[in-house]
A protein has these predicted regions:
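Extracytoplasmic
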Residues: 10-36, 218-223
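Residue-level signature of mid-helix packing/kink "hotspots" within the transmembrane helices
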Residues: 26, 50-58, 143
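Extracytoplasmic gate region of multi-pass secondary transporters
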Residues: 28-29, 199-240
Length: 240
């Protein structure tokens, strides 16, 4: 059966999407201290991001099964873009919480969706390699974001640069085809409860839950800690 999409183009789009997630995960780190200097309560923003990432990660699966990958990738990227712009524009703490929630929610969807689509479009012989390359794109996005903030003092400029690049990629997503939706069988509540009888599954879930939480929040606070207690200059703390 002939595919209705280009595997290479879908893979490139997935890599771009996960790179955006890398930006989203580290977005607060370099700018949290400047925000706290002018806005009381900014240090609570990472908690809101964690809630957004959690919800996005949970909800993307049923939506993909029903509607497919393409427009969910577009919408999640647009939410991430709007979150970045909110951080660049707003000075009100409530609007910043809304922005960071959108950023986390969109990023959580991007993380799950991009891994899912790459796992679907490649067979067993290539899947592992392609997923490894995809994971490296997360690091690329995070590294580029860190370097931009290291060399540019005004944090709004990297936010705007990332937004422009993301807008161009969203246009690219709209122009290519993705694998169609594959509605799955109905999953009953008893099926879900039945998973609780596997202790190893629960253990791995708990480990990943706390690991992801620490990963998401530690990057936001590390720069502030190194600057305030480690004696590092702000630029050096950002690069760390």
């Amino acid at each position: 059966m002939q595919k209705s999409y280009s595997t290479n183009l879908v893979f490139i789009a997935s890599c771009a999407g996960l790179a955006f997630f890398g930006v989203a995960m580290l977005s607060l780190g370099p700018i949290l201290t400047p925000l706290q200097a002018v806005i009381d309560g900014a240090y609570a923003l990472p908690s809101t991001m964690s809630i957004g990432i959690l919800l996005g990660t949970i909800l993307f699966g049923p939506v993909v099964d029903k509607f497919g990958y393409k427009w969910l990738l577009v919408v999640s990227s647009a939410l991430t873009l709007m979150g970045l712009q909110g951080l660049a524009i707003f000075k009100d703490i409530n609007l910043l919480h809304l922005s960071i929630f959108m950023l986390g929610f969109g990023g959580g969807i991007l993380n799950g969706e991009t891994n899912a689509v790459v796992a679907e479009i490649y067979d067993d012989n290539k899947r592992g390699t392609k997923l490894a390359i995809l994971g490296a794109c997360y690091c690329v996005g995070a590294l580029i974001w860190t370097l931009l903030n290291y060399f540019i003092e005004d944090y709004t400029i990297p936010l705007n640069v990332a937004s422009v690049v993301m807008a161009g990629c969203i246009a690219f997503f709209c122009c290519i085809s993705f694998p169609p939706a594959k509605p799955s069988e109905n999953v009953t509540f008893s099926n879900v409860v039945g998973l609780l009888k596997y202790p190893s599954l629960i253990l791995f879930a708990l480990v990943l839950f706390f690991q992801s939480a620490f990963e998401g929040t530690s990057g936001s606070y590390t720069i502030s800690y190194l600057g305030n207690f480690g004696g590092l200059a702000e630029s050096d703390a950002k690069l760390s």
